[in-house]
Amino acid sequence: MNKIIGFIRLEIESGKASPSPPVGPALGLRGVNIMQFCKEFNNRCKQLNIKDGVPVPTIITVYDDKTFSFKMKTPSITYFIKKHLEISKGASKPGKENFLNIDIRSLYEIAEIKKIDSNLDIKSICKSLIGSVKSMGIKTIIVKN
């Protein structure tokens, strides 16, 4: 078994891994074959049907023989919230102004996606999501049918 010499954490846009920064320099410092990583990452994005341009948090494990393995995670909570609400950023003064509302059902759907990466139950993930939207100046509402 190869010895692990390090971990590299990067957020890479799906389908767009290339030797340019931040990927190239981070992998080059550890002696990893950059082009091989880029090809494998982009191929895995295609296999998983991840849309191009989605930021994918990636943890790359580098071994002593300069080989690597990597794990892709789901995008950040803020990415999903901004995408759902079609905004580019949160409020400039969160806590003092709420400029948008989000339905609790939408947060539940995001929590279902984030559950893949987490050991937490869905209730805990939803609580975390509520805190995230609050820090972005977004109010959580319950819509009754």
From Swiss-Prot:
GO biological process: translation
Gene3D superfamilies reported in the protein's UniProt record: Ribosomal protein L11, C-terminal domain, Ribosomal protein L11/L12, N-terminal domain
Coiled-coil annotated residue ranges, if any: none
Subcellular location, principal: mitochondrion
Keywords tagged on the record: Mitochondrion, Ribonucleoprotein, Ribosomal protein
Keyword Ribonucleoprotein: yes
Key word Ribosomal protein present: yes
Alphabetized GO MF terms: large ribosomal subunit rRNA binding; structural constituent of ribosome
SUPFAM superfamilies: Ribosomal L11/L12e N-terminal domain (SSF54747), Ribosomal protein L11, C-terminal domain (SSF46906)
InterPro entries, per the entry: Ribosomal_uL11, Ribosomal_uL11_bac-typ, Ribosomal_uL11_C, Ribosomal_uL11_C_sf, Ribosomal_uL11_N, Ribosomal_uL11_N_sf
Pfam families associated with the record: Ribosomal_L11, Ribosomal_L11_N
PANTHER family to which the protein is assigned, alphabetical: 60S RIBOSOMAL PROTEIN L12 (PTHR11661), LARGE RIBOSOMAL SUBUNIT PROTEIN UL11M (PTHR11661:SF1)
Alphabetical list of HAMAP family matching this protein: Ribosomal_uL11 (MF_00736)
Protein name: Large ribosomal subunit protein uL11m
Source species of the chain: Reclinomonas americana
Gene transcribed to yield this protein: RPL11
